[in-house]
């Protein structure tokens, strides 16, 4: 295997699935992660959608990401993943390169990557900037470890029972005003502090676009915040403020 994927910072495991349908195995694996951001890689858009639907049925917060989605939907998914509103991103190899996604601790290969190059780019999403990370290959009985993974890989044995992952600390709010309305990050932060009663620790990253903005707010503060700012104006303008879908 190339030195790009043999870094001591990445621990690689095989997770055995009793059936070709790996959804339950994936869910059990995700439930063993106490913290950290996770990317689940699938080989097809349809698989991303199917995995996403299953996780939704299990009420597991996640975002889906693939080339068949509108650009705005993809941008929102990445923003929510980056700001900690979602700890799980289910994606095709579109997320394997060229995206600024820091601090990913877990990579799950729901499907085996089609090539060594694809594996390298997927695994390269974790253990960046001197952090440590883990890579998991979910294999059913008829699948074998790829030849380019020469070293013997440890099996990751799933517990019979595991708790559910903690919900994300943050929630993303949509604000229906942006740069074209002369709204900037300072305006949004000030509005949330003054009208919403939030502190600096309650507000995460703010992303302002031309006609709208996103802001991360501590999840346990959102309900009261929306009540407080329901009829308030930002810089004298009425605007829609809601939890981003």
Where are these regions (language model features)?
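Conserved segment of the helicase C-terminal RecA-like domain
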Residues: 88, 115-157
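Hydrophobic alpha-helical packing residues
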Residues: 55-56, 81, 192
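Conserved two-lobed SF2 helicase motor
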Residues: 40, 78-97
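Interdomain coupling/hinge region of P-loop NTPase helicase/AAA+ cores
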Residues: 1-73, 110, 138-151
